[in-house]
């Protein structure tokens, strides 16, 4: 469910195919400390805004912060079955863009409304990490719950994207769920380890050192909100990810992909979540949500 990933991969894969590889190939890229610091600053400021939203039911959803007319239109569209997508950007305290040297920060919001399901059914599905490989395939090749303590989860995803070339990643994530009241929950997911897999599914399979790879995905955080209201559940997800930058001289060609394709990926994630919940509501899902 994280997974607004295929977009970033597609953009970077295209860049690799259209640019000369540096000595030793694209695997020479290194995640530098200053890049990590910039990403962490971006996350910290974003979480400060999210903390304010989840502190009270009337501010809970991101769309609740829209001006009144726009908010009414957005909620009506969600209730009609539309999928809301918006590109977000967090700036520093002086309003300046936060630049991650040698990297790109991708930040998108997706929202859906699923009628006829409860908050408990929704939580049951999204916490069933052993079945995420069924819900979010083909990008999620394998999913596994490693440990759970109350509302804290440690999970594993094996991710794969086939586009021009094939990229496989082994990833670990810490996920934390927070109850606000009986109708409002939210969660936060943090990648703790992302390793690119070379020669995947062969006897020569091995992981490249984390942070010393092709830069397809260095970090990804996901922020989910769940609100039971109006006869169903509103679901929002913000995805913040860090990838390598676009090679010099190709921005004119690659930038449109970087700015638009992440939207398509998160749209897939939200749509798959809604589809699985709807199937469970109608009794057509093997996951049997809420049972």
Where would I find each of the regions flagged by the language model?
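Eukaryotic helix-grip
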Residues: 25-290
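Long, low-complexity intrinsically disordered segments that are proline/alanine-rich
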Residues: 19-25
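Bacterial N-terminal signal peptides
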Residues: 2-19
